[in-house]
Amino acid sequence: MIVIDRESPNGNAFNILGVAVQLMREKGYTSEQAEAVLEEMKSGDYDNLCSVFEQTFCDDVELI
């Protein structure tokens, strides 16, 4: 399991989006599925981004 500390440099939005892209590739998401997740992540503020990320990748990543 990947652990990302929201208070660390790795906890910034750009890194979290990058981790999401990497995980979606590994899991075989289609382009359409990946785009939908990214759009939802980017549709609000940082807390929304983290919430969608955690809901989507709860088996693979823990945000602390």
Predicted segments — roles?
Residues 1-64:
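Long, contiguous binding/interaction regions
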